[in-house]
C-alpha cells in the first residue's frame, strides 16, 4: 500500500530524481524562468521554495545548507544576495506555474515555472 507516501517517482531512481531537481532548481534560480513538464514543475516547488525561504536569513550556516542542496556557488550567491532580499516580506508562494500546452513529440503537458515578482526584461528566453 502507498498510504502517506508523497512525491512522484517520475520513472527515475532516487539518485536520478535528486540530481534532476537539483539541476532544475539551479536553472530556475539563475534564469528565473524555465520550461518543463507539468508533473516536474509541481515537484520542483517542493525543492525550490524551501531554498528561497532559507535565503531570507543570510548566515554562514544557511549558505552552507543551500550549497549542500544546489552544489552551485553562483546559485547560492544569487539566492542570498538577490532573491532573499526580494522575497523578505513574502510568506511563501515564490513560484508561479503556467501551463503552456503540450509537447510535440509525446503530447506531454508542458509548463513554465517562474519566480513571482521577477523583473520582466525585453525578450527573455526560457532555459530548456
Curated annotation (Swiss-Prot):
It comes from the Bacteria. Pfam families: Ribosomal_L17. It comes from Pseudomonas putida (strain ATCC 47054 / DSM 6125 / CFBP 8728 / NCIMB 11950 / KT2440). The keyword Ribosomal protein applies. Belongs to the bacterial ribosomal protein bL17 family. GO terms for cellular component: cytosolic large ribosomal subunit. PROSITE patterns: RIBOSOMAL_L17 (PS01167). One of its GO terms (molecular function) is structural constituent of ribosome. The gene is rplQ. GO terms for biological process: translation. This is Large ribosomal subunit protein bL17. Keywords: Ribonucleoprotein, Ribosomal protein.
Amino acid at each position: 500500500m502507498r498510504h502517506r507516501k508523497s512525491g512522484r517517482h517520475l520513472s527515475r531512481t532516487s539518485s536520478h530524481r535528486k540530481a534532476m531537481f537539483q539541476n532544475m532548481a539551479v536553472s530556475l534560480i539563475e534564469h528565473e524562468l524555465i520550461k518543463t513538464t507539468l508533473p516536474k514543475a509541481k515537484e520542483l516547488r517542493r525543492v525550490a521554495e524551501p531554498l528561497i525561504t532559507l535565503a531570507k536569513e543570510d548566515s554562514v550556516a544557511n549558505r552552507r545548507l543551500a550549497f549542500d542542496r544546489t552544489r552551485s556557488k553562483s546559485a547560492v550567491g544569487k539566492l542570498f544576495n538577490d532573491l532573499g532580499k526580494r522575497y523578505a516580506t513574502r510568506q511563501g508562494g515564490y513560484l508561479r506555474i503556467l501551463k503552456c500546452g503540450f509537447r510535440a513529440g509525446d503530447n506531454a503537458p508542458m509548463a513554465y515555472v517562474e519566480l513571482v515578482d521577477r523583473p520582466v526584461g525585453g525578450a527573455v528566453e526560457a532555459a530548456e
